[in-house]
Amino acid sequence: MDMRVPAQLLGLLLLWFPGARCDIQMTQSPSSLSASVGDRVTITCRASQGIRNDLGWYQQKPGKAPKRLIYAASSLQSGVPSRFSGSGSGTEFTLTISSLQPEDFATYYCLQHNSYP
């Protein structure tokens, strides 16, 4: 079943987080995308400087609090389906959804935990 949705429903955020020592800019790509149920979806997050594996991936649906999917770059949060996976370290990170399900249509974003305001 082809279940196309507006790109903004699977939108991505470009986030910038000020750091205590210096500013770390997080850039996601693509900025938005359109996908169908069953598709393999890959989202990339790049840090302006190395953050080791201090990165989490989050899913947010309208009117709901963010849900953490991945912590420490590649560790699956308890209760999160195994179709979600994370990889990377240093400056480049990837979130992959191996087979997109209807409930996966949401906004996804990365958050670095290496440096805080």
Swiss-Prot record:
One of its GO terms (cellular component) is blood microparticle. Its main location: secreted. Residues 1-22 form the signal peptide. Residues 24-117 form the Ig-like domain. CDD domains: IgV_L_kappa. The keyword Secreted applies. Residues 23-45 are annotated as: Framework-1. Keywords: Adaptive immunity, Cell membrane, Disulfide bond, Immunity, Immunoglobulin, Immunoglobulin domain, Membrane, Secreted, Signal. PANTHER family: IMMUNOGLOBULIN LIGHT CHAIN. Residues 72-78 are annotated as: Complementarity-determining-2. This is Immunoglobulin kappa variable 1-17. Residues 111-117 are annotated as: Complementarity-determining-3. Disulfide bonds join 45-110. V region of the variable domain of immunoglobulin light chains that participates in the antigen recognition. Immunoglobulins, also known as antibodies, are membrane-bound or secreted glycoproteins produced by B lymphocytes. In the recognition phase of humoral immunity, the membrane-bound immunoglobulins serve as receptors which, upon binding of a specific antigen, trigger the clonal expansion and differentiation of B lymphocytes into immunoglobulins-secreting plasma cells. Residues 46-56 are annotated as: Complementarity-determining-1. InterPro entries: Ig-like_dom, Ig-like_dom_sf, Ig-like_fold, Ig_sub, Ig_V-set, IgV_Light_Chain. One of its GO terms (biological process) is immune response. Residues 79-110 are annotated as: Framework-3. Residues 57-71 are annotated as: Framework-2.
